[in-house]
Amino acid sequence: MEKLRCAVLDDYQGVSTRLADWSSVSRQVEVTVFREHFSDEEELVAALSLFDLLVVMRERTPFPKALLERLPRLRLLVTTGMRNASIDVAAATARGVTVCGTASATEPPVELTWALILALARNVVGESTAFRQGGPWQHSVGVDLHGKRLGLLGLGKIGSRVARVGAAFGMDVVAWSPNLTDARAAEVGLTRAASKEALLEASDFVSIHLVLGERSRGLVGRSELARMR
């Protein structure tokens, strides 16, 4: 029996074959990994036209209705994580394409969030670059997190865990989202900001933890950044 053809897109880090176990489907599925991003739609369609299954890395390549209509062989579209706003699920379903996701954990994004915050506060990148280029040694002074205000846009599973770490550092943590209530904020032990603008104006650090969608797209732009202190 001819094998089904599966393509993995935008695997910049080469993790799909290194961290995932494909052994259970190796006899039925032939896997091709594309590590480089296809920025041109014509090139993308040409590359994917012969594949039955696609695996996408988050929102790196959107799949709107127009693109799905140009992939007649496609039967299954898998995204890392359970939600991907860049896939037109309704259009895929109408064409008989099954869309599904993989299980995800909250710990990795929380850890990455704090790695980025700490690197920024302590100027880790600048100091490392200076060290590697021959100096100057210790040319900047870091910023303490204790006593600073952390503003969270979004207080779901990830945001609430980020909040707990912030509290452990002795930070004043506030949160805001379109649907956040005082009761939900109190459950996590913090205060709900009166508005997005109020949060931005009073926070030393801001971290966004909202699902990408029409309501959250462009949430922070030039005018919002100008409000930050």
Where are each of the predicted segments found?
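Residue-level detector of alpha-helix initiation sites
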Residues: R83-S86, S104, P108, K157
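Residue-level "edge-of-site" marker
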Residues: H37, T61, A105, A130, ...
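Tryptophan-centric aromatic hotspots in well-structured domains and transmembrane helices
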Residues: Y12, F34, R58, A103, ...
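Rossmann-like dinucleotide/phosphate-binding beta-alpha-beta segment
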Residues: S24, H139-R229
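An N-terminal-biased, well-structured beta-alpha scaffold segment characteristic
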Residues: M1-C100, E201, G221
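Short, charged, surface-exposed secondary-structure boundary motifs
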Residues: E43, S86-A90, P109-L112, A185-E187, ...
